[in-house]
Amino acid sequence: MTQTQSTKTATATAIYSLTIAPACVLRGRSAIAQAGDAIARFGKRPLIVGGSNSLAATQPYLQPILQQQQLQSAETAYGKDCSERSLETLREAVQTHEADFIIGVGGGKALDSAKLVAHQCKIPIVTIPTSAATCAAWTALSNIYSEQGAFQYDVTLARCPDLLIPDYGLIQTAPQRTLVAGIGDAIAKWYEASVSSGHSEQTLIISAVQQARILRDILFQKSAAALKEPGSETWQEVTDATVLLAGVIGGIGGAQCRTVAAHAVHNGLTHLLASHGTLHGEKVAYGILVQLRLEEMLQNNQLAATARQQLLKFYTEIGLPQTLDNLGLGDITLTELQRATEIACNPNSDIHRLPFKVVPQQLMAAMVSTTAPVGELKIKN
């Protein structure tokens, strides 16, 4: 057998694990009120994990069905971040309550915490998002942060949640800013997947990339109208796009359809204390502009330049950040910015999935010129 034949055989027999979707999704207005039987099948002693605000917001929705199903529940706040210390506290809470399943409520960090502790304790997980800010309620992935809120690493989980309940009535109570951030996070799927996997010939990856393009188009077409009419059918469709469809793309694409520079920029910015007042999707949305600016400056990519101008118009329309100043980082020092770029360019960073090399100085130039007119500040490799 030749080396080429051996390689082809190895590739053909390789085993890939896909965690595409939650086992069940119950969505709709008042979905929680209809989910009693679906929740109760996981056990009798749920531990409800969330942030303090999310726990308070979901209590009127959850408590009636918990009482109806005669479930003995306990609540615990995950803390400020999905960190190793907070996960240790949550594992202790599982043992203390003798929980047989977890109900995660809240936004991205709360749900990541709930999913990961359920994974570690090998018990079922139900996710109930309180906003449309991320697709965390869907995915088999948790992001770990330091106690100071700086991104550290991510953990791939054995499966997606056992039950996902997007209740539009509950999600509508979240500040509109969370949906705007969710739009920013979701739309990044296209700009990152098309770069990291756009040339793949694998069926599922092609499908994931094309779904990301469809997701982008839905958000371009419907976001402004959705934000003007919270609770409307269009609003529900955009909510589905940010929470559900974004998760589908990650599930189908798997580990080979990954984030690129937009999330690398986000990860670097989390190491700056001044960035902690902004949401995940807001930093990612800004990171998309940085990624396109890099393609424009380092490759003279005119399609990237056009896409950046299109996004700037869209961001203005719905209120996504376009500059460091918009992120509340207008007064950071050069040293702080350099630190963020060095972290974003570390050897294991997603930024290296770009088809060209990026060094911190080039990234810094892109980060301070996201709104530059087309054709300005080209940099040669």
Region spans (language model):
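ATP/NTP phosphate-donor binding region
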Residues: 2-100, 324
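C-terminal charged capping/lid subdomain of soluble metabolic enzymes
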Residues: 2-4, 302-381
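A glycine/threonine-rich phosphate-anchoring loop and its flanking beta-alpha core
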Residues: 23, 119-211
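Short glycine/serine/threonine-rich phosphate/pyrophosphate-binding segments
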Residues: 32, 55-59, 109-116, 134-138, ...
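Generic secondary-structure signature for well-ordered alpha-helical cores
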Residues: 40, 67, 71, 95, ...
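A short, small-residue-rich loop immediately preceding and capping a beta-strand
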Residues: 94-132
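Active-site segments that bind and position negatively charged phosphate/pyrophosphate groups
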Residues: 201-317
